[in-house]
Design a protein with these regions (language model features):
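Peripheral, non-catalytic segments flanking oxidoreductase cores
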Residues: 2-374
Length: 374
């Protein structure tokens, strides 16, 4: 079945975002006291079973958690990749577009305010450089004027990020299996023996398979505080409320002033998305990594794990005069991986799913060249 024939399956996940246009949730401000809404999990203080349990509780109840002292990705790795990212965005826009042209079908290259969220129907106030881990996607998109070190460091950083993402997925799947076995007895145990290993369905740089993506993001400063306030009144966001398409996202944030603004729905399990508030996600802990569950993994686990809405609000006060930088590593299953559907629904491949979500997010752009290949 083609991606177009399967589009209604993708639409079910996009629908949550689209409803924000009329629900009023997208305009709500964040809770003043939301520090405890997103769990912080310290790898250094936990044994394996307790780590699995804490990760699963956070993933199933909030869909967001922050890792400290996590393996594979060190603070120095994050800082070094941010240095390359910031150098990339310092270049003239025309140079970025020429050196790294965006291709929606390949989900790779440089884009400037192209992403239109279903939740706002407005363009996000950002620019980004997307690296999808496939040689054919990147062969004409690595910025030659930045030298070979940019590509080499980015590949290494993506490799370390994937190892951490796979570890998180394995922990979550192991704990889910443990809990289902405890609830279901011997029959459930036999069923779980046949359950597929989701973590193993992720690769880098394998042609016609790999879909994992690193997105380096720059939210440009505004010319004045008043300009940011005016755009906020018109409904603009730095990134409109959305869920991610992947299995898990590793989000790397700068700690300096002006780099805040990331928020997630605070109590979606309790209140539903239509009635929840927003919770601020801390960005000030050096070396910390924010993780959220994506739609793929939520669908693969029949909704046991929560893919939570999140957004980047418009800056307030003097924040508006600062750039905001972040990086997101999207652990997306290989093209041929079949995403198990909810009971009674069809399955689809990870390739079909990603193409469907690209259409939903870039279909609103007026740039026909962007969408022609999708």
């Amino acid at each position: 079945m083609s991606a177009i024939e399967n589009s209604h399956i993708v639409d079910q996940d996009v629908d949550t975002e689209s409803k924000l246009l009329t629900s009023g949730l997208g305009l709500k401000r964040a809770l003043n006291d939301s520090a405890n809404s997103v769990p912080v999990i310290d790898f250094s203080n936990l044994d394996s079973d307790l780590l699995d349990a804490k990760l699963y509780d956070a993933a199933s109840n909030v869909g967001f958690f922050t890792l400290v002292n996590a393996p594979f990705v060190e603070k120095e790795d994050i800082d070094r990749q941010f240095e390359f990212s910031e150098r990339f965005f310092e270049r003239a826009r025309a140079v970025k577009e020429q050196e790294s042209p965006y291709n929606a079908k390949l989900n790779s290259g440089y884009e400037y305010k192209l992403q239109v969220r279903p939740s706002t129907q407005l363009k996000d106030e950002k620019e980004s450089f997307q690296v999808t881990a496939k040689e054919s996607s990147m062969e004409t998109r690595w910025p030659k004027d930045m030298g070979p070190a940019f590509e080499a460091n980015t590949r290494e950083f993506m490799g370390k990020s994937l190892e951490l993402a796979k570890m998180v997925i394995a922990c979550l799947q192991r704990e889910r299996r443990r809990r289902r076995r405890a609830q279901g007895g011997e029959e459930e145990e036999e069923e779980e023996e046949e359950e597929e290993d989701i973590a193993s369905k992720h690769s880098l740089w394998v042609e016609n398979e790999s879909q994992c993506t690193l997105r380096m993001i720059h939210y440009p400063p505004f010319d004045s505080v008043e300009e940011a306030e005016d755009q906020a009144k018109m409904g603009y966001m730095r990134a409109g409320a959305h869920t991610d398409w992947c299995n898990v996202t590793l989000l790397y944030q700068r700690t300096e002033f002006g780099n805040g603004g990331l928020e997630c729905a605070a109590n979606p399990r309790r209140d539903g998305f239509e009635n929840t508030e927003w919770a601020q996600i801390d960005h000030t802990n050096p070396g910390a990594i924010t993780v959220n569950i994506g739609d793929m993994l939520s669908r693969w686990t029949n909704g046991d794990l929560l893919s939570n809405l999140h957004r980047v609000r418009m800056p307030e006060g003097e924040e508006a005069l600062k750039s905001r930088h972040s990086m997101a590593f999207f652990a997306q299953a290989d093209e041929s991986a079949v995403i198990r559907a909810y009971p009674g629904q069809e399955s689809l491949t990870a390739k079909e799913y990603i193409l469907g979500r690209i259409r939903s997010n870039y279909g609103g752009t007026t740039d026909k060249a962007v969408m022609a290949a999708v």
